[in-house]
Amino acid sequence: MLTKPNTNNTTSDKTPIMGATQTSVAQMVRYYNSKSSGYDTFTGENKKYNGSLAKGGASTIEQFAKIVYEEAKAEGVRAEVVFAQCMLETGFLKYGGDVLPNQYNFAGIGATGAVHGASFENVRVGVRAHVQ
């Protein structure tokens, strides 16, 4: 959580995880594009997973961000928090750790030290699991 000093010089004003989203799909897309390129393309050993996100229902970063926005809103979670955590966990959707792109696991759920963790049937279900 982000903290800001209040008038009493204490830190009680925090950015909540739950609540109304303070961003838009377009802002999430701009943020992604400022940090990464080649959506749904992978390098090295993960190159064989090129197109996995499209197969899972999100062929563009716009579609991916829209899914994040919709799933977060449905659960009362701020989409910008979900999106930021997803980008952190997946290296801006490039992966490279224990989780593979075709698992649609955007939060590293169940992944611990060489264990791939949970797999989900598509992007939306994976995002929903992350949000919940």
Predicted regions and their residues:
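Catalytic cores of secreted/periplasmic lytic hydrolases that degrade extracellular macromolecules
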Residues: 2-132
